[in-house]
Amino acid sequence: MKRMRALSLLTAVVVALPVLAVAAEVPEENFYPTVKQEAGWMGYNSDNSIAYSKPSSLYAMVNGLRGQMPKEMYLCASLETKECTSSEIDAFDFNAIFTKCQSGADTDCIESFGIKNEDNSIDLATFERNWVPGPVFKGDRAKFLPVGYGPSTWTLTSKSGITETYALSVGVNGYINLRNGSGKANYESFLAAIQPIKEVSGAEYIAGVAQVTKRAEGYGPGWNTNFIERGCQIAENGKCGYRLPFDLEKTYVLKVRLGQPVQGWLHGRMKDANVIMTTAADNSQVVEISAKPLSIPSVYGWVKWSELPTAVKELYPVGSGGTGRGFNDFLTPDLASRTLLTKSEVSGDYAIKEMNLWLPLLNDKAAAMRTFWVAQTIRGELPLESQNCVRGKGFTGVIGTNAVVYSDGPPKFDKAEQSLNYTVGASHLDSKGELFKGYYQLNLRSDVARCLYGFGSAPIQAKIEVSSSDGTPSVATTVINEKDGWLKMTAGGFTFSTPSIKVKLSQEAPATSAAPAATPAPAAKPVAKKTTIACVKGKTTKKVTAIKPTCPTGYKKK
């Protein structure tokens, strides 16, 4: 497991070039932490936007099977690149950014992008170009390897004549195992990131380019972040797609064609998300996502290595990933002389633990608030006894939240509590020092919910409980409905740092009438009767009427 953790960190190995701007001079939307240039510091950065600007890349690896540290690694322009055809190569890793679909038969491309109006009509954007001319690497249709391009820009002109430009980084990450016989690409994740931008020019802007990075135990992928640190969402040499804030009330619609279907869960920075997936006979898939963007805290700060608690130091051994002043910061065994800015993962127990350890050191406050529209797949699994409910079902559900970090994978099904449990985490305060209010959305396929709970066809009822890390209830506004084969639940208005969300589903058995029978008729089974109980909390009394009434959280039966 330690090796796998190390390998995942390799994807975040970047070297920062000095940037003169300081946070106070930069609008919050363009804020991105810069790396200290003096020795002996450790920085925390929760902002995961670096992952949304990852360039297209195709790597060939020796000893590159999953869970191993590659002994050798090469950048490839295609599967036929000389260094990438060696008999020692046992795997390829790729990140393929899509361009616009050119014909109805194309896959692994963007079909359309636009904004949904109040009457549900859609204003479609115009594709302008891919940044970075030409394909970054060639695909191979026979092996299901997509072509890798640079990110694209699209324009929308309003009725008042105002033109807006958007940067789209939409694509898939995947893997080719040459030792398992098939030698064909397998899509491991799907990512779609949209951002309003304006184009600016300057010699200081450098395109994000994939690199091979030497590590203490081998090699790993990496890329430069110069343009991100300068407030750009995308870049090419001499040009920057400078980030602009979203209108949080607009609903953006993205339609993508994939050569392989999305599996599991879709999660990300989405509000009021609705996802439609259509799979064709050839196993290709059309994914349509409509959602509003969200404002997310960026938690960031530096502490001298010598002043860090031991529990924090233990998270960053020699070879840890992040952004350093140079490659020596990744290799040196003298950790007190190293300066490293960690890049938090967006999900998982490790990410939640890491942020919880840093928040007290950073006053539990965001350094900036930035807007995002991001959707990506996540592969986490349910417990063994529940996996039959999702195995082979393809797309299972949607999770949208404004939390900085959150649980990895789908909500965990607690059989004893009969609840779906999820943990989210963020700073208690926003960048202005005001309480940051949480948002959480769960769309769960109705057939999956019925399987998990053993429900019949009657309508499902749900209850959302939000409690703080110490177990006390948190005030939240919840909305629940079942429609078109989906159970949709949202919770909002709760506060952080790491609240736990529990979704409890229930279903009342439908009343049945006695069937006709010969005389004498047997006695009909009694219909379940509702009863009323009184519940108290301090001086407040509530009456609850149900077949099996229970008191709300915080109340006791009188």
Regions found by a protein language model. Give the residues of each.
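Secretory targeting and sorting signals
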Residues: M1-E25
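Long, leucine/valine-rich, helix-dominated scaffolding and oligomerization segments
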Residues: A24-I378
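Solvent-exposed beta-hairpin/edge-strand motifs
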Residues: Q102-I110, V132, G454-G471
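Solvent-exposed serine/threonine-rich low-complexity stretches and specific carbohydrate-binding patches
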Residues: P473-G485
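Short Cys/His-rich micro-motifs in 6-15 aa windows
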Residues: G554-K558
